[in-house]
Amino acid sequence: MNYLKEDTIAALSTAAGKSAIAVIRLSGENSFQIIGKIFKTHSKPEQQVKHGYITDGIEKKDEVLCTFFKAPHTYTGENLVEIAAHGNPVIINEILNLLYKNGARPAGPGEFTYRAFLNDKMNLAEAEAVCALITSKTEMSAKAALNSLSGEFSSKIKNIRDAVTNLIASMEANLDHPDEDNMFLSRSEKLSRFDSCIKDVQNLLNSYKTGKILQYGIKVVIIGKPNAGKSSLLNAILGKNRAIVTDIAGTTTDTVEETIDCCGIPLIITDTAGIREHSENLIEILGQAKTREAVCKADILIWLFDSSSEPDCNDAKIADFLKKSDLNIPIICVLNKSDLPPLFSSSLLNRENKVKVKISAKTGVGIADLLDEIVKIAGVSESKNDYLMINTRHFILLQNTLESLIRTKQSLSAKDADEIACFEALSAQISLNEILGINVKQDILDTIFSTFCIGK
């Protein structure tokens, strides 16, 4: 990613397509000069928001409002202009082309936020939170991302980093002046403080699972024999007819995926083709192969049974498939068609020893109980509002930090190992700094910002 900081960049910052208003962002040292070439206004020079027209010098292209932000008090830390234009793609392209012709260049993915990072307007963890906030799927995930963007996660990292840095300084001073031991922290005090740092890191690591769930959602796959009511269950959960439902076995021949907000958790629910003992239909066979593929990617499995009939060879085949798959995920056994006389024998379920929920996809009875069970398994409480968005990069670096701190403590406990303890503590400090974006390799930065949308 070859982002030249000296360039002035421009891009559409609002969603593409027709809308009432679209915002074009222009950032860089020459932003004011470039916009001055195509923006004509009668507003007073001291006004920050100015009304006028975009023109190519011959004719007007649009009536707009331009907001001027002077460096360094801007999102990027540079001179920045936001053009509020009418949201017609034809007009937007004309304005962008005029900006490019007059000295700006198209911004790359996340380049505005990248410049904010380079200009110390935010650290790397906060920049990543910007992307997480934009892509949030639920209100709770947006709150978690905003908490991180507001600096709550960074503050915790800085506190641990500063504590480690102070301990390193004490250890280095101790090594330089071994005869003045009484002037520095005692060994027991150092061990106690490292213990505190370890606990703080462990608490953040424990937040990773929740952050991952809020950011990416939970994949819930519905599996069962043909006509168990899988598609009806999907429709009942969604509250609309998304999947085709008939009395003909094998109606669903492909996976159908939908996402819902369940108590703040994004649930990615997949309806699958039914698995049965014998099938000569090629399309159905291919559908069953996709079912097996979806099961292997699931976070939670809903195994659906028809409670109005006895378990048969198809149920047994699914049980055998799950056993051979050796899945290490929660499986919820759901007895569907509770509105009909029960004929289902629980012997198969007793052997499986899984959570059991009774529902009727037709009437909606038990659907809320099923969703409650999924939320319970996820372990995310909607009443909490202090969640943080900790991503995989942070998790790996926090793990590295934890391992380094544990080795530091072990070395401090041993005799004549102070230099090793100091080295390990420095490793922890480096990992913590990387989370904040200090001394991070360019290829890592390129990877992070390439996931952003253009215009942010």
Swiss-Prot record:
Q: What is its EC number?
A: 3.6.-.-
Q: Does the keyword Metal-binding apply?
A: yes
Protein residues bound to K(+): N227, T246, I248, T251
- Say which family it is in: Belongs to the TRAFAC class TrmE-Era-EngA-EngB-Septin-like GTPase superfamily. TrmE GTPase family.
Q: How does it assemble?
A: Homodimer. Heterotetramer of two MnmE and two MnmG subunits.
Sorted alphabetically, which NCBIfam families does this protein's record hold? mnmE_trmE_thdF (TIGR00450), small_GTP (TIGR00231)
Q: What is this protein called?
A: tRNA modification GTPase MnmE
The organism named in the record is Endomicrobium trichonymphae
Q: What is the lineage of its organism?
A: Bacteria, Pseudomonadati, Elusimicrobiota, Endomicrobiia, Endomicrobiales
